[in-house]
Amino acid sequence: MAPKVTSELLRQLRQAMRNSECVAEPIQAYIIPSGDAHQSEYIAPCDCRRAFVSGFDGSAGTAIITEEHAAMWTDGRYFLQAAKQMDNNWTLMKMGLKDTPTQEDWLVSVLPEGSRVGVDPLIIPTDYWKKMAKVLRSAGHHLVPVKENLVDKIWTDRPERPCKPLLTLGLDYTGISWKEKVADLRLKMAERSIVWFVVTALDEIAWLFNLRGSDVEHNPVFFSYAIIGLERIMLFIDGDRIDAPGVKQHLLLDLGLEAEYKIQVLPYKSILSELKTLCADLSPREKVWVSDKASYAVSEAIPKDHRCCMPYTPICIAKAVKNSAESAGMRRAHIKDAVALCELFNWLEQEVPKGGVTEISAADKAEEFRRQQADFVDLSFPTISSTGPNGAIIHYAPIPETNRTLSLDEVYLIDSGAQYKDGTTDVTRTMHFGTPTAYEKECFTYVLKGHIAVSAAVFPTGTKGHLLDSFARSALWDSGLDYLHGTGHGVGSFLNVHEGPCGISYKTFSDEPLEAGMIVTDEPGYYEDGAFGIRIENVVLVVPAKTKYNFNNRGSLTFEPLTLVPIQTKMIDVDALTDKECDWLNSYHQTCRDVIGKELQTQGRQEALEWLLRETEPISRQH
């Protein structure tokens, strides 16, 4: 993985920072966040500005360029990847480590007095802007909006913004019509005297209107904004895709609807001008709702006295709690996904000993088996197919230069998922096709114990996900080990594979309490640099728990695994498990047999069925 040579790009960018045609006044630093104008985690090629400038293409990271320095902040998932992809012009800032300065503190330490720090106001989230501006201002510096993105100025072959056809989803998939969703949203707006609600997150717009797209690879979303009023709906979207007969019928565009459900379609780039026009007509007490994750440009288009910011929008919270149709769809999707993976692992067991399977060919085979399943649309993220030392790169994606051959001597980790019309999947399994070492088994067993501890947890209603994070780490901590990523994230229903507002992470952030119907992942891991990676990941559904007592009548919750793929018992030090942990695994494997075995039979996949039965034999400790 040769690093990208960035000297000339940095020279051009620094020149733009001083050029009066690009900035009103020279700036001494320029910030390049990861996201797009919608603060998306996964972005279209035209928005990969940070990757273009630095070579680092992980999904999380912020680049800051000054006249003399170029620094990159990223989290523990990407330390190894960033170090390999960036050349020596760059300094890697490892977020979460005690000696790593924050972006603000670093800027204060390196900037000359009275410096101006620039950033594209359409890309930077409002909450980030406020935090950065406050620290810089206190040190005598200024954070300033640069309306023409400077990276775009030097990116001569920047791709066009995608504008692909839309897909409509019926009630069998969504459970609720878009009109009902708008009505529910308006009730929440009325409760707080909100007259307009600005929707900027792409997955929230897709969910609200029961539409899907493919403008961003692996994420079924489309570039758009929406403004919902108490009596008006405005959808900002480009291209003629809204005129497709199925879409027009779905959105009722040709019907003489009552005005409150009539959708006004406007150009995508007119969002700021239209928002300013709406705000000009507000009476003194009227408020406009917007997420504090929305761009600073959108937030600033709303006068401060009328602006009502929130960390999570009502759409974000409603989307996270799956209704019965969405939950049923997610179950169907995970059954199909398990069938594909049983086929894959059976194939790998046969082919790896022959010596011809690589990380890339294994990932391709996983996609091939998934494509055979009904309603398959796309992968849900690039497959992480990694063997041996590549497994220690947490978000590794194989490329020809790094592509290793799977062998009988190394641990193999595959983290993969799919988008089906009825749901989104995300599953990780770690396997050995030969004989694992005692240390590999020991580490795998610690990870498994953590996985079981979360999955089997019973906790009071109202518990936030970060309180469960230590459950996953306890066995690792006992031996002085740990992992540098969160334990779980929310999962969309045929939407983004990562979604808020819930999750399981050691980071203290304003996550919403877990409630029945939410879907998250359970994915502890352990990574030995230069040797191997281990992760066990299931998607789980939050469900009510049956308990002996009910303190203060508050109720309890637990998790139901939706992922039903065998966990390789060869990798387990069974005697290190408790009886309760053995019982959990045996029960889980029995469910795999009952549910996935039946589907494999229905689809006539006999060899994969035989593999499933072999891999789900009960285990027991030697007493």
UniProtKB/Swiss-Prot annotation:
It is found in: Cytoplasm. It comes from the Eukaryota. This is Xaa-Pro aminopeptidase 1. Expressed in all tissues tested, including liver, adrenal decapsular tissue, adrenal capsular tissue, corpus luteum, testis, submandibular gland, thymus, brain, cerebellum and heart. Highest levels in testis. Binds 2 manganese ions per subunit. Belongs to the peptidase M24B family. Its main location: cytoplasm. One of its GO terms (cellular component) is cytosol. PANTHER family: XAA-PRO AMINOPEPTIDASE 1. It catalyses: Release of any N-terminal amino acid, including proline, that is linked to proline, even from a dipeptide or tripeptide. It comes from Rattus norvegicus. Keywords: Acetylation, Aminopeptidase, Cytoplasm, Hydrolase, Manganese, Metal-binding, Metalloprotease, Protease. Mn(2+) 2 binds at D426, H489, E523, E537.
